[in-house]
């Protein structure tokens, strides 16, 4: 019984606003060109009060001419209220709980002198498309119902199958 209660508590854990930085396991040197290192800045991701996520810019050195792909993926859940454009615009005609994702991916090209200038990356739950059963209805995330369930930020070098940098919560 205790195990079931503990599992349920973990399943409902939400990612709180705050800044998330690399841990000891965030960098995997086996998945990078030989002398890759942070030249300036440091990767971090900030979860804002509205549950949008902003990840910082930084520069990697020692990458040679190796490009990379960065990805920021967030998983959300919320109650979606569907409104009819007709007579009562203040009351939803239908509501449902929805799980959805917001994702941003970019390819970063290495510059001269073996440097990789990694730009800032962001996602927002409000940019993810919401749907209603009737295409004539307008979907809206119900205030106070939005939960950020998890997010993962990765940077993966071309020619490598796994990320060099991972920040997850």
Model-derived segments and their meaning:
Residues 1-14:
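Sec-dependent, cleavable N-terminal signal peptides
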């Amino acid at each position: 019984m205790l195990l079931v209660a503990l599992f349920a508590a973990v399943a409902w854990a939400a990612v709180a606003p705050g800044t998330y930085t690399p841990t000891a396991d965030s960098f995997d040197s086996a998945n990078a060109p030989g002398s890759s290192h942070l030249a300036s800045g440091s990767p971090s991701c900030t979860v804002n009060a509205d549950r949008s996520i902003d990840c910082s810019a930084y520069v990697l050195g020692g990458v040679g001419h190796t490009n990379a792909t960065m990805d920021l993926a967030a998983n959300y859940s919320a109650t979606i209220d569907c409104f009819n454009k007709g007579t009562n615009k203040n009351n939803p005609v239908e509501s449902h709980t929805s799980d959805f994702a917001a994702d941003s991916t970019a390819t970063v090209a290495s510059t001269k002198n073996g440097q990789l200038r990694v730009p800032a990356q962001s996602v927002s739950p409000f940019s993810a498309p919401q749907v209603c059963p009737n295409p004539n209805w307008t979907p809206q995330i119900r205030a106070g119902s939005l939960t950020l369930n998890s997010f993962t930020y990765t940077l993966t070098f071309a020619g490598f199958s796994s990320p060099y940098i991972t920040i997850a919560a």
